[in-house]
Amino acid sequence: MVLMRGQQRFRVLTAGETAMARRLFGDAIDYPAVRIFNRRYLPFGLQPKNCAMTPNGAMYFHHSCCLRDFSTGSEHARHWFMHEMVHVWQHQLGYPVRTRGALRIGLSYRYQLGMDKTLSDYNMEAQGDLLADYFVLKHLQAASAMRQPRYANDLPLFEQVLSSFLTHPGERKNLPKGIVRRLR
């Protein structure tokens, strides 16, 4: 694990990180606009070391876990990066990530796959884990890195639930339902 240098406050995505994210999001993200900060977002130590935050289209990792290139990190690091990229995607499509994150009541990271569900049926944190789990299962064949390994043998079910997203990742209809979506 190679960490970012202490004096480097932020960086852009590496070529490897961009390639990794493109496998899931295609052209739905403005990749050059994404920044990864080598510091907490919240002041006064309110953001735990092992907690990244992506409230505004940029990622904020504690310096002890901010890698120089997440695409060369462990499978768990790549899962974490992809979870945070989901929040970048949500933000860039107009979802109020910062506002919804501040009102975390009821935001479980857990998801339950079902043939009758689509990605928009899940809250913003569940979307993060669902898409990151799908990514590590489909592209890394790393079920051990999944947050919900009970779905390790359910790739067809993931693809059913994600069918609209996989076909059109840039459409706002894939964002979480149940909250007013910010207009651009």
What is the predicted role of each segment?
Residues 1, 54-63:
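Short, charged N-terminal helix-start/capping segments
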Residues 2-5, 11-23, 28-29, 35, ...:
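Metalloprotease/metallohydrolase-associated module, dominated by Zn2+-dependent proteases
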